[in-house]
């Protein structure tokens, strides 16, 4: 058992292409299923956090059984099983690892260290031996009954007992661990009851169908987890590190920021890296959904899991172990399971009432007719047992999480990361979208188009001063000014006391003097008023360079519209989703972009103004806010759902409920379509699960169906629900 690690802060959840340290807090539950196993420790009110990988789970109901087993232990504050990644997470006041492992084992499952290699799969024959044995015994029993009825009955009893033994043993384990109404318990009671009333053939058939259903559910669950498994497989196990001019093969966990690695043509990056080679093409489709290889130049960042298409490349490692793009997406998947949709929480609560209620109905059906109306005991005991099997909530329990997990996985394949079912549900309801302009509707790489200095200062001096203040800033306009100075090979002085003025600009001390870079209109500039008006009317953005309250000049910049912006807006309109631009830019520059796209706009907004605008719009209909900067974060928080562009700042990415990693606006359209398809899928699944139960409830009471058909209906509903959810993965 490995020693717990100490962690202290939380990594941005959407910074899929930024090198950041991954941290686990006891308040940050990972919930999806790719478990790390060595228990991890966090110092906060929730005590210590431990995590393991769980083996033996076939469906979401299994995850709940493990949770129930651990929840009964003293000292446990919180427990959650992330089915998609097969991970158990426990927050406890003290070290209870041994007790947790014992409790899970008693419930019929096993735990292993998170860093341990996956257990080798059992052979097909060994895995299916109980099912094969039961099928053979059933065939023999049927044959014997045809020739000798008493011997056939004895054979069916023997078959039932052989099939019942492992199921009843598991039922007892689950009862001891707190799962009183598990399907194993219902099956055991039904099979024993069927033997009691002489329905030996049906008792055996019930168990056979149950085992077949378990195998089908296991297969469906593995298919649902394939997306996560494929993502985990993107990272190679080893990397080639260059040290002192020599190559060495090392495990990827030993890589640290600053290490230099080589990746051969066709090889995958083991960590996020900065390209040191002159240029190269990378296939990033597994992470972003971008099918065309991406060209990268020296200094560009490349995410872990990307494939070098055509040449040997050298990179500098940027990410810590466990903090690469792939790790952060897996972390997101885990967190997504914690942020369950309201409908999922409702179904979970309903299913907890549903099974005991059906059992009570079954008991009444068994007792009332014989006691009050002198009906046949055998007939009504049989009907009561059949109702017991109808009471299994498996299909209902997985109806929502199966669809949501598939929807989230399908979105991730297309480069859209969504923070869980709650965000997915909100996204499906969106009927209007508010866009930031710079970096969202535009490429976010503006260029300097004009420099107009005041009398007594040259263009190069003005640009140098502006670049000194803007150096290190993340805003696209700031980067454009610095880039222009670098291209002109100007010597940029070091600025001190740099401070961002949210919604206004940025200021710093340069050569002992206060210099402010701000938007036109944020500071008086009468001498340049006519020129500013002319430039803004042409759709350009103008910034002022102010030193000690004196305007030294203006710099004009212009961005280009994203290539797919017009198409995305048109497709959103076709979905009945209206768009509006909310920007801090000047009204004339905003009007130029809005005119090209046919959108309404509000310009010159401070962050608080954006929040007010979003709040007002959100009152009329659910609104999504799409942005990429620090000034967009408050508005994203105020919207029904915030969506960040993948190239955005860490603040925007953390605040957002979803992100487009590939920076294509058409991904927003696909995201909304997928969210709506997921909701339709959930409704279909609930209809299938409850509809089949309702039909067989009626037919059972009318005496039209019996035990084995009830099991078939339960198994069939579970398989149908899972298969229907998997359709989302094939959606294009």
Swiss-Prot record:
The active site is at residue 436. Pfam families: E1-E2_ATPase, HMA, Hydrolase. The chain crosses the membrane at residues 125-145, 147-167, 180-197, 203-222, 357-377, 384-404, 686-702, 708-729. Keywords: ATP-binding, Cadmium, Cell inner membrane, Cell membrane, Ion transport, Lead, Magnesium, Membrane, Metal-binding, Nucleotide-binding, Phosphoprotein, Translocase, Transmembrane, Transmembrane helix, Transport, Zinc, Zinc transport. Zn(2+) 2 binds at residues 392, 394, 714. InterPro entries: ATPase_P-typ_cyto_dom_N, ATPase_P-typ_P_site, ATPase_P-typ_TM_dom_sf, ATPase_P-typ_transduc_dom_A_sf, Cation_Transport_ATPase_IB, HAD-like_sf, HAD_sf, Heavy-metal-associated_CS. Residues 48-112 form the HMA domain. Zn(2+) 1 binds at residues 58-59, 62. CDD domains: HMA (cd00371), P-type_ATPase_Pb_Zn_Cd2-like (cd07546). The keyword Cell division does not apply. GO terms for molecular function: ATP binding; ATP hydrolysis activity; metal ion binding; P-type cadmium transporter activity; P-type zinc transporter activity. GO terms for cellular component: plasma membrane. Residues 1-124, 168-179, 223-356, 405-685, 730-732 are cytoplasmic. It catalyses: Pb(2+)(in) + ATP + H2O = Pb(2+)(out) + ADP + phosphate + H(+); Zn(2+)(in) + ATP + H2O = Zn(2+)(out) + ADP + phosphate + H(+); Cd(2+)(in) + ATP + H2O = Cd(2+)(out) + ADP + phosphate + H(+). Its EC number is 7.2.2.-, 7.2.2.12, 7.2.2.21. The record marks 693 as: Important for metal transport. It comes from the Bacteria. Changing residue 202 to D: Lack of ATPase activity. It is a multi-pass membrane protein. Residues 146, 198-202, 378-383, 703-707 are periplasmic. Has two high-affinity metal-binding sites, one in the N-terminal region and another in the transmembrane region. Both sites are able to access and bind metal ion independently of each other. The N-terminal metal-binding site is not strictly necessary for activity and metal selectivity, but is needed for maximal activity and may be involved in regulation. The metal-binding site in the transmembrane region is essential for activity of the pump. Confers resistance to zinc, cadmium and lead. Couples the hydrolysis of ATP with the export of zinc, cadmium or lead. This is Zinc/cadmium/lead-transporting P-type ATPase. It comes from Shigella sonnei (strain Ss046). The gene is zntA.
């Amino acid at each position: 058992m490995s020693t717990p690690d100490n962690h202290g802060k939380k990594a941005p959840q959407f910074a899929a292409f930024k090198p950041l340290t991954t941290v686990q807090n006891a308040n940050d539950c990972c919930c999806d299923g790719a478990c790390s196993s060595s228990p991890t420790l966090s110092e906060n009110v929730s005590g210590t956090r431990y995590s393991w990988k769980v083996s033996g789970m076939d469906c979401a109901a299994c995850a709940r059984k493990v949770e129930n087993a651990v929840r009964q232990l003293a000292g446990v504050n919180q427990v959650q099983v992330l089915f998609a990644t097969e991970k158990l997470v426990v927050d406890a006041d003290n070290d209870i690892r041994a007790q947790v492992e014992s409790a899970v084992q008693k419930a019929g499952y096993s735990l292993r260290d998170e860093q341990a290699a996956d257990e080798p799969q059992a052979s097909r024959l060994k895995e299916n031996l109980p099912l094969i044995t039961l099928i053979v015994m059933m065939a023999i029993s049927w044959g014997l009954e045809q020739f000798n009825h008493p011997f056939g009955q004895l054979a069916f009893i023997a078959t039932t007992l052989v099939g019942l033994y492992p199921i009843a043993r598991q039922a007892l384990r689950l009862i001891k661990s707190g799962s009183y109404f598990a399907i194993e318990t219902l099956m055991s009671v039904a099979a024993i009851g069927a033997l009691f009333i002489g329905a030996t053939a049906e008792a055996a058939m019930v168990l056979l169908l149950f085992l077949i259903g378990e195998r089908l559910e296991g297969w469906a669950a593995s298919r649902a987890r394939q997306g996560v498994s494929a993502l985990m497989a993107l990272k190679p196990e080893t990397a080639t590190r260059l040290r002192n001019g020599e190559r060495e093969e090392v495990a990827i966990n030993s890589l640290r920021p600053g290490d230099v690695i080589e990746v051969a043509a066709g090889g995958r990056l083991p960590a996020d890296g900065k390209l040191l080679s002159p240029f190269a093409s990378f296939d990033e489709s597994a992470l972003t959904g971008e099918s065309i290889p991406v060209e990268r130049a020296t200094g560009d960042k490349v995410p872990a899991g990307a494939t070098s298409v055509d040449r040997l490349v050298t990179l500098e490692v940027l990410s810590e172990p466990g903090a690469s793009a792939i790790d952060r997406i897996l972390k997101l998947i885990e967190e997504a399971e914690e942020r369950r949709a309201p409908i999922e929480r409702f179904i979970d609560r309903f299913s907890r009432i549903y099974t005991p209620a059906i059992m009570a109905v079954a008991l009444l059906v068994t007792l009332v007719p014989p006691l009050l109306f002198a009906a046949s005991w055998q007939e009504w005991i049989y009907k009561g047992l059949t109702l017991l099997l109808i009471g299994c909530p498996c299909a209902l329990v997985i109806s929502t999480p199966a669809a949501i997990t598939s929807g989230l996985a399908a979105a991730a394949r297309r480069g859209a990361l969504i923070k869980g079912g709650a965000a997915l549900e909100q996204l499906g309801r969106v009927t209007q979208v508010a866009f930031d302009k710079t970096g969202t509707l535009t490429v976010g790489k503006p260029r300097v188009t004009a420099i107009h200095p005041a009398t007594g200062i040259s263009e190069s001096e003005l640009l140098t001063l502006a670049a000194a203040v803007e150096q290190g800033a993340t805003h696209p306009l700031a980067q454009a000014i610095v880039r222009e100075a670098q291209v002109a090979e100007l010597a940029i002085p070091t600025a001190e006391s740099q401070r961002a003025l949210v919604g206004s600009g940025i200021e710093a001390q340069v050569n002992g003097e206060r210099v402010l870079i701000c938007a036109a209109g944020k500071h008086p500039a009468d001498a340049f008023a006519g020129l500013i008006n002319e430039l803004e009317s042409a759709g350009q953005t103008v910034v002022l360079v102010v030193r000690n309250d004196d305007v030294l000049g203006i710099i004009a910049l212009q961005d280009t519209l994203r290539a797919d912006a017009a198409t995305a807006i048109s497709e959103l309109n076709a979905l009945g989703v209206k768009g509006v631009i909310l920007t801090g830019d000047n009204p004339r520059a905003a009007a130029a972009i809005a005119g090209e796209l046919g959108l309404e706009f509000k310009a010159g907004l401070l962050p608080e103004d954006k929040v007010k605008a979003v709040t007002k719009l959100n009152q009329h209909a659910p609104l999504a806010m799409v942005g990429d900067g620090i000034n967009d974060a408050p508005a994203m928080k105020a919207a029904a759902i915030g969506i960040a562009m993948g190239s955005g700042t860490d603040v925007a990415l953390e605040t957002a409920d979803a992100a487009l990693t590939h920076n294509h606006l058409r991904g927003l359209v696909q995201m909304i379509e997928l969210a709506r398809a997921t909701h339709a899928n959930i409704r279909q699944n609930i209809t299938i699960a409850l509809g089949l139960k309702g039909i067989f409830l009626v037919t059972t009471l009318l005496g039209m169906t019996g035990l084995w058909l009830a099991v078939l209906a339960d198994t069939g509903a579970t398989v149908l629900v899972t298969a229907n959810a998997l359709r989302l993965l094939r959606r294009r």
